[in-house]
Design a protein with these regions (language model features):
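N-terminal pre-ligand scaffold of iron-sulfur
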Residues: 1-68, 83-84, 98-114
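Short cysteine clusters
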Residues: 51, 75-78
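Short beta-strand His + acidic residue motifs that chelate non-heme Fe in jelly-roll/DSBH
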Residues: 82-83, 91
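Short cysteine/histidine-rich metal-coordination sites, predominantly Zn2+-binding motifs
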Residues: 65-73, 89-97
């Protein structure tokens, strides 16, 4: 789904603290899915909230995500660690796999699906 088809923003950029995560519901290929959003400065990256290891959600409670001392997103179920640059699993049971990216666009201080 493109931003033109979904004019409603997912979340305001300022609602995500710098270096923090947020959860948003997105529609991908016609399915409503949970996504994890990560803000770094003025950029926001997004991935589906699904670990490639066992298909479980990454958050330990709805919208609550773990970040390691090394600065990786950590799956609460089995401890897989994912790079916040590209979503690649850098440690854990699915090393070498990657999270499914969600294309985002920032406009007027809001985050939209791209």
């Amino acid at each position: 789904m493109s931003a033109a088809e979904s004019p409603s923003p997912l979340i305001a950029v300022d609602a995500i603290a710098d270096g923090a995560f947020a959860e948003a519901e997105v529609c991908v290929d016609g399915d409503h899915e949970s996504a994890v959003l990560y803000r770094q400065g003025e950029s926001v990256r997004g991935w589906l909230n699904i670990c490639p290891h066992a298909g479980r959600r990454l958050d330990w409670a709805p919208g609550q995500f773990l970040k390691s001392r090394e600065g990786h997103l950590v799956c609460a179920a089995h401890g897989a660690s994912f790079s916040l640059e590209d979503g690649e699993c850098v440690a854990g049971p699915c090393k070498g796999d990657a999270l499914r990216a969600v294309a985002l666009q920032l406009r007027d201080g809001q985050v939209y699906l791209a």
